[in-house]
């Protein structure tokens, strides 16, 4: 089944889970698409089975809190950032609920975390104005970059380069093997004082970069030329909430939730809005991602919703 405008318009909430007492701050699908794991401001980690459509288990990170949870390539392991006490990144085995390793180094809150799509490397960006490069096998930082502002960062789909959005005004591209030589490309954007960038994502085909903000718009950028292709708006975000925006796996569409529980979908190429879906969420939709392998997506406020299409094209 192929994603089309009509298929997207047909999506409806199939299941809602109320496992959390506070907002879900992040979730991540496993590479197989079979499970999704969430982190929440209530200090819990919840693992869901996407095929059976039910929560499998709940773990807690009471002391340090949990945010920016990400699957690694090994089965049943995740990395995540702390949101209280310290700014250490933690590597957890879900199998026995034990920490495998800690990654200390950042002196302020980690705001961006990206796992390499190909190996055990990951990068983290922090309010301490640094990006650090790590290897899951070592607690020591493998590389450090000092920047001129708050960073958001992500690997490209090949895992050969990473992009850093700095101070909400420029995107720099780095070659992973020689990042200490500085960026090989820098794209300056129009600075907007009304909001800041909250995330940077590549499309799966590597051609597009999506810049999310805590304002009322998103920017879609050509990953090779740095030109802004589209600015997407018309959704509600009056309280400057961090709303997650995502590409669909085919790189054809972009979606974002809003503070009023609706999901807005645009066509990347034309820039046209193709759907507004009502998730009936009780709060702002802070997290939204399409499943990498199956025709389903998930959205979250303090509740988690699984969506399915109601037509088969």
UniProtKB/Swiss-Prot annotation:
Source taxon at top rank: Eukaryota
GO annotation, cellular component aspect: chromosome; PTW/PP1 phosphatase complex; Set1C/COMPASS complex
SUPFAM superfamilies found in the cross-reference section: WD40 repeat-like
Protein name: WD repeat-containing protein 82-B
Location within or outside the cell: Nucleus; Chromosome; Cytoplasm
Function comment: Regulatory component of the SET1/COMPASS complex implicated in the tethering of this complex to transcriptional start sites of active genes. Facilitates histone H3 'Lys-4' methylation (H3K4me) via recruitment of the SETD1A or SETD1B to the 'Ser-5' phosphorylated C-terminal domain (CTD) of RNA polymerase II large subunit (POLR2A). Component of the PNUTS-PP1 protein phosphatase complex, a protein phosphatase 1 (PP1) complex that promotes RNA polymerase II transcription pause-release, allowing transcription elongation.
Main location as per UniProt: nucleus
InterPro entries, sorted: G-protein_beta_WD-40_rep, Swd2/WDR82, WD40/YVTN_repeat-like_dom_sf, WD40_repeat_dom_sf, WD40_rpt
Family label: Belongs to the WD repeat SWD2 family.
Cysteine pairs bridged by disulfides in the record: none
Annotated PROSITE patterns: WD_REPEATS_1 (PS00678), WD_REPEATS_2 (PS50082), WD_REPEATS_REGION (PS50294)
WD repeat placement: 19-58, 105-144, 146-184, 192-231, 236-276, 280-313
Keyword rRNA processing: no
Entry keyword set: Chromosome, Cytoplasm, Nucleus, Repeat, Transcription, Transcription regulation, Transcription termination, WD repeat
One BP annotation, GO: DNA-templated transcription termination
Cross-referenced PANTHER family: WD REPEAT-CONTAINING PROTEIN 82, WD40 REPEAT PROTEIN SWD2
SUBUNIT field: Component of the SET1/COMPASS complex. Component of the PNUTS-PP1 phosphatase complex.
Gene Ontology molecular-function annotations: chromatin binding
Listed Gene3D superfamilies: YVTN repeat-like/Quinoprotein amine dehydrogenase
């Amino acid at each position: 089944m192929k994603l089309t405008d009509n298929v997207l318009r047909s999506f409806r909430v199939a299941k809602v889970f109320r496992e959390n007492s506070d907002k879900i701050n992040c979730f991540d699908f496993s590479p197989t698409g079979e499970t999704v794991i969430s982190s929440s401001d209530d200090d819990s980690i919840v693992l869901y089975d996407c095929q059976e459509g039910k929560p499998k288990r709940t773990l807690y990170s009471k002391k340090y809190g949990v945010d920016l949870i990400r699957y690694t390539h090994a089965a049943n392991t995740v990395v995540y950032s702390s949101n209280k006490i310290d700014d250490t990144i933690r590597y957890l085995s879900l199998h026995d609920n034990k920490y495998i390793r800690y990654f200390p180094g950042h002196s302020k809150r980690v705001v961006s975390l990206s796992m390499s799509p190909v190996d055990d490397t990951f990068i983290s960006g922090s309010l301490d104005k640094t990006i650090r490069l790590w290897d899951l096998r070592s607690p020591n930082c493998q590389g450090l970059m000092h920047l001129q502002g708050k960073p958001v960062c992500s690997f490209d789909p090949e895992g050969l380069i990473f992009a850093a959005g700095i101070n909400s005004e420029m995107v720099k591209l780095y070659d992973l093997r020689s990042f200490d030589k500085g960026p090989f490309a820098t794209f300056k954007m129009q600075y907007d004082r009304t909001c800041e960038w909250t995330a940077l994502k590549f499309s799966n085909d590597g051609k597009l970069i999506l810049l999310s903000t805590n304002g009322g718009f998103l920017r879609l950028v050509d990953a090779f030329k740095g030109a802004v292709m589209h600015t997407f708006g018309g959704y509600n975000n009056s309280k400057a909430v961090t709303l997650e925006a995502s590409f669909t796996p085919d790189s054809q569409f972009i979606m974002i939730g809003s503070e009023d529980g609706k999901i807005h979908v645009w066509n990347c190429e034309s820039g046209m809005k193709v759907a507004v879906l009502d998730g009936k969420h009780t709060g702002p939709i802070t997290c939204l991602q399409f499943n990498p392998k199956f025709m389903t997506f998930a959205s979250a406020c303090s509740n988690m919703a699984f969506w399915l299409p109601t037509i088969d094209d």
